[in-house]
Every structure is written in structure tokens, then in C-alpha cells.
Design a protein with these regions (language model features):
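Low-complexity RS/RG/RGG-rich segments used by eukaryotic RNA-binding proteins and nuclear co-regulators
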Residues: 110-131
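Extended interfacial segments that mediate partner engagement and assembly in macromolecular machines
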Residues: 141-278
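Rossmann-like S-adenosyl-L-methionine
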Residues: 3-18, 24-27, 55-71, 77, ...
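Internal alpha/beta scaffold segment
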Residues: 241-281, 285-287, 308-348
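Short beta-strand micro-motifs enriched in acidic
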Residues: 82, 206, 219-225, 292-296, ...
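Short hydrophobic/aromatic beta-strand micro-patches
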Residues: 53, 90-94, 219, 292, ...
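Short hydrophobic/aromatic beta-strand or adjacent loop that forms the aromatic wall/cage
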Residues: 88, 215, 532-536
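Canonical RRM/RBD RNA-binding surface and closely related RRM-like beta-sheet modules
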Residues: 33-38, 46-88, 93-103, 111-112
Length: 541
């Protein structure tokens, strides 16, 4: 899903306040020119963008990517299809030479019986400058302070439950259209389960609804109303015309330990000779602070993100030493840091660029406990953001799966193995598969850490190794679990309806075997004070 530059956001959007310091970045006399960024020295793919028109009516994003990269040997840095079935797409490259080559190859090329038209595309205006030019002088965005939804808990749960009911009802209607043979079955289910295709159990939640997040990514920037350097949350997006950062003091789902850590590093940034990063001018250094926290182990990890700009290796080394000294001996020593990393976040030249991580001091990981088991959390490892509610989530998964000692649990896209390892004692064996080798290494360590002997983990893409891994199962009865988001599998239950429908399609060359039909669903609220909610749905065939 990162191919389409879409990010899952289960957290909140809020902001922070900071303090003015010397060495501020000055806005140039072209500050109101929305195209001034094209004249700067830093890389932007907008300089080398083309537009492809007359695309086929039916094609997939991955098909287009494969055509460009594999068949035509082009090297795009970004592919954007603004409108589904719109017949056109933008493609960006690293250089003028690569752009010219692409234009020559693509213009007049025939694909799926369509003759493509390729031409140079105009760069988009800087959205921040564009919005700023449109704002009246008295519309000060920094006067806003975004807070989380503070509805009563019962009101939040009722709202989420209603959204889930709507999604399941839509699923039932779409399933009948896709597989008319199931019409009678759907009507019977709806009469039995209050117009729903399956039983929907009451929404489950943790009693801890404030300060529950075990991971937060704080922005580092300037609060426009005070001029102070601040570690907190963006008040709005760049596209909305805001780069201001606001305070986290009143943000409900950030725990006190994280607030103390953020404020501590904020003091370091305010006293630093290096300025905060400017998203508009691409100057400055301090960009982000990621905080991870083990509630049950009281272990804290900090990941300091900065743009190194033109800093020498010696200057970076000195900066790293300053951070270490601050948290070990200076004012930051009151904040007990278990693990600290420095991350160099440079401007990405392609979607495959991964910011480099450098371990500064402490352990290379922290740990957290789920359902009594201990799990290692590396800096970039996925881990559910609400530890207390994750206990409830995993217990509910085990309940729905109906695991027994003659069942194989197939943990698809298992990550670091948390689900499978928590449920291992309820089944005969666990087989986990995951495309990221580092995650599989963590999963194996976690299995050893918890003395789990009936779990094996395999590296590979699900579509490539699922059949071979399933073939290893010792039992005829197999229960598969998949935890989105994955490519083609959204995490939002409203967007996942298509996947549900595909599971219930009639047997064909594409859809082999009998259809999977919904049996029971359980909502679990992992994200109080936000509109998001997890939905576990159990299908059988």
C-alpha cells in the first residue's frame, strides 16, 4: 500500500508549542511563489514528471508498475494514479535524461490495445504556499489547537458499533450481487441476526482509555503563535497549509511517560545550535522524535530523527555524543531511557529509500508483555499501539478461532509472531509466514523467550509461500489469521468489504474452492478518542 503513498493512521492529529531561538531559517523574497521550490538545490521528482494518458479502462496499479519497471526497463521514483479508471497517470523520475527516455518509449506505445500518450507534466504548486496565499491576514492557523474527541466512552462505543453494523450490512448486499446463489442464505442470516450477515457480538474495550498509546511519532517544529521550537504534533498537514507544531499536554491518549520524554528532548532542541527542519524550505535539522514504551516493563525507547543536511561525519558524531550525554548525565537523565537511536531522515528519492538507524546507547530493543508473554520490540517492528486492549484483541481472536489440540494455526503476515505465540498453547502447532526477514528473526527470538516449542516461522511473501507452508501442517483442520494492513487488504473495515465479498464468490478458475462465509464478528476498540476500531471476523467454508 505504500506504492500509492497511502499511510494508515490509527493515531490522532494534534500539535505543540516551543521557544524562539537564534539561527532561525529566513523566508526568501520568493516566499509567496508556489513554484519557488523547483529552483532549490534539493531533489524533487516534480522536476522530472510526465503524464501518461489514454490508459486502458481496466488495469491495476501493480500492472502499470510492472509495465514501466520490468517490461520497459524504466526507473520511476513515483507513480500516481489520481482517479481510478481515469485513463491517466503521473510518473516521476530521478533526472531529465530518465524523463526524456520515458517520453520517447511511452508516447505511442500500445498497451492492452490502447495507444498511450506521454507528455511532460507541469509541477504541482507548493500546497503550503498556495494555501497561505489564499488565507486572509486574520486567519491565523496557529490559533487553532487540535484536540482529540472527548465524547463520553459509551457514546464513542455506540458510534463505532453503528459504523461496523453499516459495513456488515453493506457486505451482505454486495455479497448477494457477487454471488446470487447466496441470496437465500443471506436473507436467512439477516432474519436471524437483526439484518446482518452474521452474529455481531458487543464491542469490547479496555478500561484504560487515556494515555494508552505505547508508540507516538512527535513532530519537531515551530509553534506559529509563540515562535518556540517544539516537540509535539502538527496542527494540520502541509497540504492544508500548516507546518505549525502544537503542545501535547492535553492530548488524551499520550501517556505521561511519553509527555515527559518529549518535553525533555524539547529542552535539548531549544538549546541546540541546530535549527528545526523547515518542510517548506527543506532547511534545518531536527524533524521527529519517535517514542516507544513498554507499559508492563517500564522500558522506554527514543528514536531521534534529523535531516543531516551537509553535516560532516565528525559533526554527526559530536551531535550523537551530545544527545547521549544529555540523557545520561544532563537534564535528560531524569527520563530513564532504556534504548536510544539516531535516525537520519533525508529527502526520499524513491519509495524504496529507508532512513538509516544508528544505535546510540542502551539496549537495541525494549520489551512488552501481552497475555503474560514477553515480546521484543525493535525500533521498526510493528506492535499493536494499545497494550491493554491487545490482551482483549488476542483473547477474542482465540475465542472466535475455536482452537483445539488437533488444529494448525496459520499466522499469515505474522510480523514478530505476537498473535501466534499468544495462542500457541490453545492449538497443536503454529506456522507463521512473513516477508520481512528481520521480523521473522524477532518472532523466533520471541518464541525462545517464552518457551514456545510448537511454532515455526518462514520468510516469504504470502502469495508465494502460503501453499507450501500450509502443506507442512500436521493437522487436517487449519485456521488462518491475517492482520491487515497488507497490500490489497485494508485495515479499515469499511474499505475491507471488497475483500469480504471476494471470499464469498462462487467457485471459478480464479476463486478456487467453496466460498468462505461469515460466522461471527467481534469489534474491539483499540483506539479510544479516535474514530478507529478493530473488527475480528470469522469465516468458514
Amino acid at each position: 500500500m505504500n506504492e500509492n503513498n497511502i499511510e494508515r493512521e490509527n493515531s490522532m492529529q494534534c500539535e505543540t508549542v516551543g521557544t524562539a531561538v537564534t539561527d532561525r531559517v529566513e523566508v526568501t523574497d520568493k516566499s509567496n511563489d508556489p513554484y519557488a521550490y523547483l529552483e532549490r538545490s534539493e531533489f524533487t521528482s516534480e522536476k522530472f514528471k510526465i503524464e501518461i494518458r489514454n490508459l486502458p479502462k481496466y488495469y491495476g496499479f501493480n500492472e502499470l508498475k510492472k509495465l514501466l519497471k520490468s517490461k520497459l526497463n524504466l526507473n520511476p521514483t513515483k507513480i500516481k494514479t489520481p482517479a481510478p479508471k481515469g485513463g491517466w497517470s503521473y510518473v516521476c523520475f530521478k533526472s531529465e535524461e530518465e524523463k526524456a527516455t520515458a517520453l520517447k518509449i511511452l508516447n505511442g506505445y500500445t498497451w492492452k490495445k490502447q495507444t498511450l500518450i506521454a507528455q511532460e507534466a507541469k509541477a504541482v504548486p507548493d500546497p503550503l504556499v498556495k494555501k497561505r496565499n489564499l488565507k486572509s491576514s486574520d486567519s491565523n492557523i496557529s490559533s487553532k489547537r487540535v484536540k482529540l474527541d472527548v465524547k463520553d466512552l459509551l457514546e464513542q462505543l455506540e458510534s463505532k458499533n453503528n459504523q461496523i453494523r453499516m459495513s456488515l450490512k453493506k457486505f451482505s448486499n454486495e455479497l448477494i450481487k457477487a454471488n446470487p446463489e447466496l441470496s437465500k442464505w443471506c436473507k436467512q442470516q439477516e432474519s436471524k441476526y437483526n439484518n446482518l450477515p452474521c452474529e455481531l457480538l458487543p464491542i469490547r474495550h479496555s478500561n484504560v482509555i487515556n494515555g494508552y498509546r505505547n508508540k507516538c511519532e512527535f513532530s519537531i517544529g515551530i509553534n506559529e503563535s509563540t515562535g518556540e521550537r517544539t516537540v509535539g504534533f502538527r496542527l494540520g498537514s502541509y497540504v492544508e497549509g500548516s507546518v505549525s507544531v502544537g503542545p501535547i499536554d492535553e492530548v488524551l491518549n499520550v501517556p505521561e511517560t511519553m509527555k515527559i520524554a518529549a518535553k525533555s528532548f524539547e529542552k535539548f532542541v531549544q538549546n541546540s545550535k541546530y535549527d528545526v527542519f523547515s518542510p517548506e524550505l527543506h532547511k534545518g535539522y531536527w524533524k521527529q522524535l519517535t517514542v516507544r514504551y513498554g507499559f508492563r516493563t517500564n522500558e522506554l525507547m527514543l528514536i531521534v530523527g534529523l535531516d543531516p543536511q551537509q553535516l560532516t561525519s565528525e559533526e554527526l558524531c559530536n551531535l550523537k555524543n551530545d544527545i547521549e550525554k544529555y540523557f545520561k548525565e544532563g537534564d535528560g537523565s531524569s527520563c530513564p531511557v532504556h534504548s536510544l537511536y539516531l535516525q537520519q531522515i533525508k529527502k526520499r528519492k524513491s519509495q524504496d529509500d529507508v532512513p538509516a538507524l544508528e544505535h546510540v546507547f542502551g539496549e537495541t530493543y525494549i520489551t512488552e508483555k501481552i497475555l503474560g508473554k514477553t515480546f521484543r520490540i525493535s525500533p521498526q517492528a510493528f506492535f499493536q499501539v494499545n497494550s491493554n486492549a491487545t490482551d482483549i484483541l488476542y483473547e477474542s481472536i482465540g475465542e472466535l478461532a475455536g482452537l483445539k489440540n488437533n488444529v494448525t494455526l496459520l499466522d499469515v503476515c505474522c510480523g514478530t509472531g505476537t498473535i501466534g505465540l499468544c495462542l500457541a498453547e490453545k492449538c497443536n502447532e503454529v506456522l507463521g509466514l512473513e516477508m520481512t526477514a528481520e521480523a521473522i528473526a524477532d518472532a523466533r527470538v520471541n518464541a525462545d523467550l517464552n518457551g514456545v516449542k510448537n511454532a515455526e516461522f518462514f520468510v516469504g511473501k504470502a502469495e508465494d509461500v502460503l501453499s507450501s507452508v500450509a502443506y507442512k501442517a500436521k493437522n487436517e483442520e487449519i485456521v488462518a489469521i491475517v492482520d491487515p494492513p497488507r497490500a490489497g487488504l485494508p485495515c479499515d473495515h469499511r474499505k475491507a468489504v471488497k475483500n469480504f465479498v471476494d471470499l464469498g464468490r462462487a467457485t471459478s478458475k480464479i476463486y478456487k474452492g467453496e466460498p468462505f462465509l461469515p460466522v461471527k464478528a467481534i469489534p474491539v476498540d483499540l483506539f479510544p478518542h479516535t474514530p478507529h476500531c478493530e473488527l475480528i471476523t470469522y469465516f468458514e467454508r
